[in-house]
Amino acid sequence: WRYNHPDATQTVYLQGGIHGIELTGIPVVHEFIKEIEEHQLAYNFICVPLSNPMGLDSQIMGVQTGYNNIHTNQQNCWNWNRISNLKDEPSQEGHWIKTLLDLAKPADIVLDLHTAGVEAVPHIYSHVTEVKHTEGLGIPHVLAWSNRSYSFADTHHQLGKIALTFELSSSRVVRSEWMEESLI
C-alpha cells in the first residue's frame, strides 16, 4: 500500500508480521493506514501489513510449531532478524526478502513492528545514535544496540536511515485503545 502526499519531503516505510506468526503488527499497520488516509499526513508512506506471508505457515491454530514448513516438513529456519544476509538466497524466501528491502529503499524512516510476547512489555530497539527518535512515541522502554546485527532495522541504519524496531503487545491480545495510543 502506498500513499503520496503532495507536500511530503520524507518517506516512511512501515511493516508488520516479518516473523509471520508475530501477528500484532498486522492490525496495527492496517489501523495506521486508516489514520494516514483520514488525516492526510504530510509524508509519503509505503506500508506492508504482512511482510512474511510464508511465515504464517509455521503455526497450527495460532500456536507456533517451530520453523519447519508444515506441509513439506522442510526447515524454513531463515533468521528473518538477519534479513540482509539472506537477500541473495536462491529461494522463495530470498526473493521475498530482496523485495522487502527494495520496497524500503526510498524510505527515510523505516519502522518494523514485531510482537513482544505474552509477558514482555512493549519496547523499541534502536541504534544508539537513533535513541532520540524514540522520544514521544508512547513506548518508554528502549533497547539500544551499537554492534552490527544485520537486522531489518540495522540494514537500513547502515544506509543512513532512521530505523526502529517496535516490539508491541502479545499477538493474542491486541486492544484497539493500545493501537490508538500508539498511533496518536
Regions found by a protein language model. Name each.
Residues 1-184:
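Structured catalytic-domain cores with a bias toward divalent-metal coordination
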